[in-house]
Each structure stands twice: as C-alpha cells, then as structure tokens.
Amino acid sequence: MKLIIANRGAHDIGKTTAIKNVFANLYAKYAPTTTIYEPLNIADLAYNWVDVKATIKIGSTLVGIESQGDPGSRMQQSVDDFVAWGCEIILVACRNQGDTINTITNLESNHGYTVLWLQNGKCTDPACWQKLEEKYGNWIADIIEKCALTRTLSPTYL
C-alpha cells in the first residue's frame, strides 16, 4: 500500500498546525521509531513558525511527515526523500493549485501512491478553531495509524 495524505488549502488556514498536531500525536506513541530531520531541537516545534520533517515507523510501515507546503518550500525535496527512503505513507501540506499539487499528482501517476485529499476547517472563534485543529489532527493520526498497522486503506478508517 502506498498512500499520500495531502492536507490542502489556502495560506494561513492551519495546514501546518494540523500536521504538527498529527506528528505530536504519533510521536507520543512511537518516539523510539521516530527520526526528526527538522527542526534540530524538538522543543522548537512549540513555535508557530517552525515546521517538521520526520519519519515514523509504525509496525513495519515507514511514514513520512512534512508540514511545509508553500510553493518554493522544501516540500518537493522532502517528498523525494520520503519516496527514496521507502515511505509507504506520506503526510504533507499543500496549496490548492500549482507546484505543490503537481508534486502530489506526480506521486500518484509515477510512483503508484493513492492520494487522500483533505482540508481542515476554520472557525472565527479562536478557541473553537484550536479545538477543531486538535480533533482534525487526531483524526488524521488515527487514519495513518490504522493504515500503517493493517497496510490497507479502508473506507471504515475515514
């Protein structure tokens, strides 16, 4: 099974925050099988402007996580790295159009990945938005964990 989960959306909708929440959730369970490439100090993830690039081994499945998804970011290089390292599941942020979308569709057409396009919600109330991001991150982490452990993508996981 090869799966890429693309958290897409416009600038400042919370894509990076959601992916960092997914990472935190999975890291809490799988820290011994995690390799963090960015940032060099995990404590820096508490800052909004810091992105994460990491791999996590869940069962026998390697998962790649990249929270940078802006055009011109390291997203393309991270995806190339994840494919070269044998990641069967990749989670990335991306915009709604342009180079980041092209990177993902290339994985589908040239590397056999199934694409799961997702988009987090937004709320004008900050407390509501924070809770929404937390629940969304937990949901994605749950999908990743189930897919990794069963090595399948089932509609029941969604």
Task: Please give the residue ranges for each predicted region.
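Glycine/serine-rich loop-strand microenvironments at binding/catalytic pocket rims
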Residues: 1-4, 114-116
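Active-site catalytic pocket residues across diverse enzymes, especially alpha/beta-hydrolases
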Residues: 26, 30, 108
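Short, glycine/charged-enriched secondary-structure capping and boundary segments
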Residues: 22, 80, 104-107
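Conserved nucleotide-sensing/catalytic segment adjacent to the nucleotide-binding pocket
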Residues: 31-95, 101
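Phosphate/oxyanion-binding active-site loops and adjacent basic polyanion-contact surfaces
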Residues: 15, 67-75, 132-140
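Glycine-rich phosphate-binding P-loop
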Residues: 3-27
